[in-house]
């Protein structure tokens, strides 16, 4: 179904003949590099001259952990976002995670010397939750470490995303991982003009959204939805134009 959807959208153009489909984003309901048909998806996109926008947990399993595998991803993606959750939750040792990020950047540096530009951007994706954003002082110091790591390697961007809960989530889960909005505001200020400001790494993510994606209307359209130009294609082929997790997995189903 993914092939049919990609081919259909890739054929649509605006009034000036420009293709409307800009990139393809593999689902992050699992590790994309472990999907049985990921290589097929990559081939379809390469044939259509489309870039992938990839989010990975940083494990780079199988052939994707080799230099040639990383180089192929760098040439086929518009952005490779590496999530920090994999080592925060114990799924991947930090030493292996950081080593893989360093190797990816080394591969990009070598490839840039040969091919020039046109290679993928590399980003870190950080989820802000109650276990890493417990109080102001500790959170700023923790975030400084991530920023320094990114700056030293030449990472292009850090996506800072707020934790999102479903309505049915238990109070204990919210108490453990929830974050006071005042701390989010403090982080924004520190990143824009304080101790976390960086001249080398760009910042993005839901921390900077005008409207919290977790609070948007489930039944309607948000006033300023950052995903309004995206189409979500499910395994059975049906399409969705709203990424709100409450709409898909909350009590509304």
Where do the PLM segments sit?
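Conserved SAM/AdoMet-binding glycine-rich loop
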Residues: 1-84
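Radical SAM enzyme [4Fe-4S]-AdoMet core and its adjacent flexible, acidic
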Residues: 1, 39, 48-51, 71-252
């Amino acid at each position: 179904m993914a092939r049919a959807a990609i081919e259909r959208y890739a054929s649509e153009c605006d009034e000036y003949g420009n293709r409307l489909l800009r990139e393809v984003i593999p689902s992050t309901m699992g590790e994309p590099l472990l999907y049985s048909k990921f290589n097929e998806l990559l081939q379809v996109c390469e044939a259509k001259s489309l870039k992938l926008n990839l989010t990975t947990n940083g494990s780079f399993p199988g052939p994707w952990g080799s230099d040639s595998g990383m180089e192929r991803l760098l040439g086929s993606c518009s952005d490779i976002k590496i999530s920090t959750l994999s080592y925060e939750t114990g799924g991947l040792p930090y030493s292996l995670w950081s080593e893989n990020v360093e190797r990816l950047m080394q591969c990009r540096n070598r490839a840039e010397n040969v091919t020039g530009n046109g290679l993928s951007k590399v980003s870190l994706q950080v989820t802000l939750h109650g276990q890493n954003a417990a109080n102001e002082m500790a959170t700023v110091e923790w975030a400084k470490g991530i920023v320094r790591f990114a700056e030293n390697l030449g990472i292009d961007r850090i996506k800072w995303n707020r934790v999102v809960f479903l309505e049915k989530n238990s109070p204990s889960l919210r108490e453990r991982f929830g974050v006071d909005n005042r701390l989010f505001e403090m982080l924004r200020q520190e990143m824009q003009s304080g101790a976390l400001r960086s001249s080398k790494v760009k910042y993005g993510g839901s921390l900077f959204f005008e409207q919290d994606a977790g609070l948007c209307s489930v039944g309607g359209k948000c006033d300023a939805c950052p995903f309004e130009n995206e189409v979500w294609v499910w395994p059975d082929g049906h399409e969705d134009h709203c990424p709100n997790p409450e709409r898909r997995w909350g009590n509304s189903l």
